[in-house]
Structure formats: structure tokens, C-alpha cells
Amino acid sequence: RFINTAALAGLTVGVAACNDKPAAAPAAAPAAPAPAPAPTAHAGANVHLKPGELDTYYGLWSGGHNGDVRVLGLPSGREIHRIPCFVPDALVGWGITNESKAVMGTKPDGNLRYTVADTHHLHASYKDGNYDGRYAWVNDKINARIARIRLDYFVCDKITDLPNVQGFHGIFPDKADPVDPAINYTTRVFCGG
């Protein structure tokens, strides 16, 4: 009996709430104007861009088990481009053409040495302590490889196998030569185990 009464009361309230007429407000003194909302840190940022509008920034993200690098526009988050590195990509012919097979590495029979990867930790090159936009590197955690990406064309142009390593996870380029202060750009990429 209690459940039936509660169900009937809920149904009555639900039907009453569906009324299109606004409820009559009691006559009262005019209320003070509502305070303006406090500005937030991202109040001016609009993440929706109309067709033809360009993003302010572009970011590079590792693709994980896809074995590629993603170029994303910011603030929209749109995927602008995929840069295949360690895994074949039939859409652009990566791993299928002779040129890309030469970069990826092949077995004596001409087949690719590896067809799986796990990209992590993308880093760009430096000059004068700032990013110079020349190269980026990304590592393949599964097969102990590192790929270099030319940032003028957004293509992978070199893959290096690291001997005697299994599962290295992080990489970081140097900002300057530690011995010669005249060399103020990236000359090496360090890999952490």
C-alpha cells in the first residue's frame, strides 16, 4: 500500500511539472540584479572553430600502439595529420613503398622487420634553449627503436635500432653540448630504461 501511494504521488508531481504555464510568482519587492558571473581562466577560449578557421597552436602526440605520431590543433583538438613511423600505413603507402621500407628496415627477404610498435614520449629539438622546429623524436617501447621526424614536412626520415636494450621508456634531447658552449642546439637524444 505504501509503494502504491508513493508511486501515485510521484506520478502526480511528474504530470504537474509538465505544465507549460509558468508558475505565478508571489508579488514581492524587486530583487537586486544578479551578480555577473566571475570570469574563469578559460572564459575567452573557444574550442569550436568554424570551417576555414585555423588553430592557434599545433601539438604533437605519440599514438601508442598505432606506432605513429599525431598532429593535433589547439584549442580545437582536431586531428590535423598522422605521421606513420614504426607501423605500416596503407593510406599513405608507409611500409609499402621501397623508400619507406628503407627507413623502417627489412629482413633479407624484403619483408618488414617489425609490424608492431608502441610509441611513447615525443620530444622536439632545441636551439638556444627553445624548440627550433627542425626535428622531433619518438621511441618505440616494444622494439627498442627511436624515430626521427622532420618537422618541415611532418615525415619520419630515420629509424634507429638500439642494441642491447629492451623496453626503454623515456627519451630526452639535450639542449646544448655540455662540454662546448658554442654548440647550443640538440646534438644527442638520451634514452632511459
Where are these regions (language model features)?
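Structural signature of eukaryotic scaffold interfaces centered on beta-propeller domains
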Residues: P39-L54, W94-D132, I171-T186
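N-terminal export signals
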Residues: R1-D20
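Conserved beta-strand positions in repeat-built beta-propeller and related beta-rich domains
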Residues: W61-G64, N130, A136-I142, P181-G193
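Post-signal peptide N-terminal segment of mature Sec-exported envelope proteins
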Residues: V13, P26-L49
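Bacterial lipoprotein signal-peptidase II cleavage site
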Residues: C18-A28
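Beta-propeller domains
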Residues: D68-G105, V138-P163
